[in-house]
């Protein structure tokens, strides 16, 4: 099971691969849409990659609740058990 810091680092790498944003700009308090300018298609790619990386399932209906990077970190941490 990954720590929240490891999850944050992993998500930053995934966001970097998808968008080209520097990993150090992907912080827990950043909004995916407002701060990082990630559209819904890119968000779905990020979710799929996060599911694979962290061995979790994030149902489509839960994705809309992941507004910030921190929301995603908390969700993945909880989903890992």
From Swiss-Prot:
What NCBIfam families does the annotation carry? Answer: PRK00982.1-1 (NF002147), PRK00982.1-2 (NF002148), PRK00982.1-4 (NF002150)
Tell me which UniProt keywords the record has, alphabetically: Cytoplasm, Fatty acid biosynthesis, Fatty acid metabolism, Lipid biosynthesis, Lipid metabolism, Phosphopantetheine, Phosphoprotein
Where does this protein reside within or beyond the cell? Cytoplasm
Q: Which GO terms describe its cellular component?
A: cytosol; membrane
A Pfam family (short name) is: PP-binding
Q: Gene for this protein?
A: acpP
| Gene Ontology molecular function, alphabetical | acyl binding; acyl carrier activity
Q: Which pathway is recorded for this entry?
A: Lipid metabolism; fatty acid biosynthesis
Protein species of origin: Kineococcus radiotolerans (strain ATCC BAA-149 / DSM 14245 / SRS30216)
PTM section of the record: 4'-phosphopantetheine is transferred from CoA to a specific serine of apo-ACP by AcpS. This modification is essential for activity because fatty acids are bound in thioester linkage to the sulfhydryl of the prosthetic group.
**Chain ranges of the Carrier domain:** 2-80
O-(pantetheine 4'-phosphoryl)serine carried by residues: 40
* Record InterPro entries: ACP, ACP-like_sf, PP-bd_ACP
- What does the entry give for GO biological process? lipid A biosynthetic process
Among Gene3D superfamilies, the record links this protein to:
ACP-like
Which family does the record claim for this protein? Answer: Belongs to the acyl carrier protein (ACP) family.
- The organism's superkingdom is given as Bacteria
Extract the HAMAP family matched here. Acyl_carrier (MF_01217)
Write down what this protein is called: Acyl carrier protein
Function according to Swiss-Prot or TrEMBL: Carrier of the growing fatty acid chain in fatty acid biosynthesis.
């Amino acid at each position: 099971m990954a720590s929240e810091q490891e999850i944050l680092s992993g998500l930053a790498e995934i966001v970097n691969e998808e968008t080209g944003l520097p990993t150090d700009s992907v912080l827990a308090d950043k909004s995916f849409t407002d701060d990082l300018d990630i559209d819904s298609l890119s968000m779905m790619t990020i979710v799929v990659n996060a599911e694979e990386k962290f061995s979790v399932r994030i149902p489509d209906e839960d994705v809309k609740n992941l507004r910030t990077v921190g929301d995603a970190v908390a969700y993945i941490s909880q989903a890992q058990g």
